[in-house]
Amino acid sequence: MQKHIIPEEATILDALDKINRLSGGAMTLVVADPEGKITGTLTDGDIRRGLLRGTGLADPVKDLVHRRFMALHVSASADERLQTMRRAREAGIRLLPEIDADGRLAGLVDLSTVRSQLPLTAVLMAGGRGERLRPLTLNTPKPLLEIGGRAIIDYNIENLARNGVKDVYVTVKYLADMMRGYFSRPRHGIMARCIEEESPLGTLGAVSLVNLPPQGHTLVMNSDLLTTIDLEEMYLHHISEGAQATIAAIPYTMSVPYAILTTDGPRVTGIAEKPTATHFANAGIYIFANSLLSRLPHGERTDAPDFLLDAIGRGDKVTYYPINGTWIDIGSPEEFRHASDLMQHHRSLTKLG
C-alpha cells in the first residue's frame, strides 16, 4: 500500500518515478498531507496533462492533485460501498482508495480483480453423487472434476471473490474428505468452510446446518454450474424488488412444429402456425433473505422448489432474475464435453464476458 502513497510536497519528477515502479495497470498514486491525511489522487494522465499546461518536473505534486476523488469510507454501509464501486467502474477508475475515520489511507481496492463487495453469505451445494457422470465421478466428486485445467467449483469461487463475497460455506457429503482437502487452503483469497450432511438433505436442506445471522441475505447455488451470471446485478434486483427470495432463471424457448388452435369450447377462435413460447427455467442459483431461510427445518430433507412454493403460498415475495450470458448445468456427459470445449481456450469465465 505504501508504494501508492506520495506526500503532496514531493515533486512531479518524484511522482513519475514512483508511478514507473508500479506494476500492472494500477498507475494511481494517493496524495497525503504532512499529517498523513489523504488529499487526492494522481495518475500518469494527470501528470501528462499538467506538463502540457506548463507544469514543471520540479513543481510539487499538490499542484496537480485530483482533489474531487472517489473513495470508499470505512464507516459507509455495505450498500453505499457497493454503489461507490459501481460509479468508479463506470468512470473507468481502477484503483479505489479506502479512507478511515481520520482521513488516512486504510486500504486500496483494485477494481480489475474485485469488482464489487456484496453483503452476502454464500452457500455452495456440493454433496451430490454425480451419478450421471460416472465413471468420472467414481473417485472424484463432481465439483472437483476439471474443466479447462481447473475444478468446476473453482470457477464459482472465483466469481464470488470478484464480487467481494468472503463468507462462503460448501455443503459436502459424497467423497467429503476430498472436498475438505480441496478447501483446506484459501481459494482466490476465500477460506471456505465445509458443512457435512449426515444424510442426503435435498437441494436446500443442508443450508439449515449453516449458522446464518438473523438479518441479511444469502446466496445459494449449485456448485456444478459454469456460469457468467452477474451476481451484483442479481443482488441489486433482489434488494430493489424487496424480495424474500430471488431465483436466477434461464430463458428456454420451445417450438411447436404444428399449427396450434385457439379454442373456446368447440369453436376455433384462432390458428397459430408453428408457434414458439419462451419460459424461464430454474438455474439453481438463489438469493434468500435470512429471515426466510430461518424457516428451514433443521437437518431435514428439503428441496428448493417445495420450499419456494411454500413461501409463495404464505405470501412471501419471490422474484426471478434472468441470466444473460453463459450457463451450463454440468450434469451429463454431453454437458461436461460442452463445458470442456468452451473452456479449452479460457482459463477464466471473465474472458467469456
Enumerate the language-model features and the residues they cover.
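A short, conserved acidic/glycine-rich loop-to-beta-strand motif
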Residues: E241-P251
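A glycine-centered beta-loop-beta connector
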Residues: I19-S23, M27-D46, L64, M85-A88, ...
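Conserved N-terminal catalytic core of the sugar/cofactor nucleotidyltransferase
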Residues: L52, R150-S223, T228, E233, ...
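Bateman (tandem CBS) regulatory domains
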Residues: M1-H4, A10-T11, L16, D59-M70, ...
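Catalytic-core segments of class I nucleotidyltransferases/pyrophosphorylases
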Residues: L219, L226, E232-I239, Y252-S255, ...
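A short, polar/charged loop-to-alpha-helix boundary motif
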Residues: D46-K62, L111-V123, F280
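The conserved cystathionine-beta-synthase
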Residues: I5-A26, A32, L51, L72-I93, ...
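N-terminal nucleotide-binding beta1-loop-alpha1 segment
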Residues: D110-N139, L144-L145, I152
